[in-house]
């Protein structure tokens, strides 16, 4: 028997949302100082290949590689499901000419994204709303592409996201996801404990396996499903985060002891350390997922 190690997914839905909001509210300065800049506005990992010259390049390259995978064209309507402060939304509007709607449950991210959109003079092409990507108010068949970059992990029920994506996409519309995936279920008690030490620190309830993702997509009519392990391209970015957290950990401990750093902020640092350990133990991988929508007969799910 595998014990339940995750404390996050035993919370109520509203409590889980509150935890996600608290995570991004309280860790924003860490991301701002150590990870992103005004050009990237990215709270995701970078994709390294022969074209990238450093950390910032890899963050932007992630957008390019995913956009190529989805075949995003000028004038297409894209839902950025879990948009953060708008980094990918802005890139898609500027580099691909897309019309983008970004959604996130985090109100402070919506406010920041709107401010950044105004600064970039992109308000005609990008808009942001506070919403749950598993249960939106958008009309059916209203998007050409649904894009999820390291945001699906926060959903308690990944299948609910795929159900809503199938409803929102026009026939022939494309889904593209970049996400952490567990390598097996179950992993065994010690491995599950290690994995969830990371996930709890990042307000993530659990990860699905590649086969679980495929099964959910198939159930809601997606075809041309492709799932690829691209961990090798993410490793430089993962190593960078590990290096940052390893060397900053003593200061984080002191900050927590002094009451300067919150429980959530300290959990983010611990989670980052456990994430790399779990990777080295082969407990998870980083995957690209893409698929094509075939119908619009998914029931309207908004309550």
Positions of PLM-derived features:
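Conserved Class I S-adenosyl-L-methionine
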Residues: 226-303
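Short, glycine-/aromatic-enriched active-site segment of Class I SAM-dependent methyltransferases
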Residues: 181-205, 217
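N-terminal auxiliary segments of SAM/dcSAM-dependent transferases
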Residues: 1-34
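A short glycine-rich, Lys/Arg-flanked "PGG" loop and its adjoining helix->strand segment in the class I
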Residues: 159-174
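Short alpha-helix
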Residues: 205-221
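Class I SAM-dependent methyltransferase SAM/SAH-binding core
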Residues: 77-79, 88-135
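A short acidic, Gly/Pro-enriched loop at the edge of an enzyme's catalytic core
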Residues: 134-146
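Class I SAM-dependent transferase core
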Residues: 22-72
């Amino acid at each position: 028997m595998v014990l339940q190690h995750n404390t996050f997914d035993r919370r109520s839905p509203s409590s889980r949302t509150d935890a996600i909001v608290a995570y991004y509210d309280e860790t924003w300065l860490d991301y701002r100082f150590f990870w992103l800049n005004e050009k990237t506005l990215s709270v995701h990992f970078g994709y390294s290949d022969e074209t990238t010259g450093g950390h910032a390049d890899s963050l932007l390259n992630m957008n390019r590689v995913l956009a190529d995978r989805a075949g995003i064209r000028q004038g297409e309507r894209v839902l950025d499901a879990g948009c953060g402060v708008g980094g990918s939304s802005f890139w898609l509007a500027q580099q691909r000419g897309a019309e983008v709607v970004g959604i996130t449950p985090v109100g402070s991210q919506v406010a920041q994204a709107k401010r950044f959109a105004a600064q970039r003079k992109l308000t005609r092409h990008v808009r942001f709303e506070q919403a749950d990507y598993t249960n939106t108010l958008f009309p059916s068949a209203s998007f050409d592409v649904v894009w999820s970059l390291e945001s699906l992990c926060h959903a308690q029920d990944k299948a609910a996201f795929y159900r809503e994506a199938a409803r929102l996409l026009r026939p022939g519309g494309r889904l593209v996801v970049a996400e952490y995936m567990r390598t097996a279920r179950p992993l065994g008690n010690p491995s599950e404990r290690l994995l969830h030490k990371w996930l709890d620190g990042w307000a993530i309830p659990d990860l699905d396996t590649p086969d679980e993702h495929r099964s959910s997509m198939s159930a809601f009519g997606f075809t041309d499903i492709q799932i690829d392990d691209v961990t090798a391209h993410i490793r430089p970015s993962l190593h960078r985060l590990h290096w940052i957290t390893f060397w900053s950990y003593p200061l984080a401990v002191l900050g927590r002891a002094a009451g300067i750093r919150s429980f959530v902020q300290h959990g983010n640092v611990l989670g980052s350390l456990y994430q790399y350990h779990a990777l080295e133990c082969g407990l998870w991988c980083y995957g690209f997922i893409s698929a094509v929508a075939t119908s619009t007969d998914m029931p309207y799910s908004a309550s």
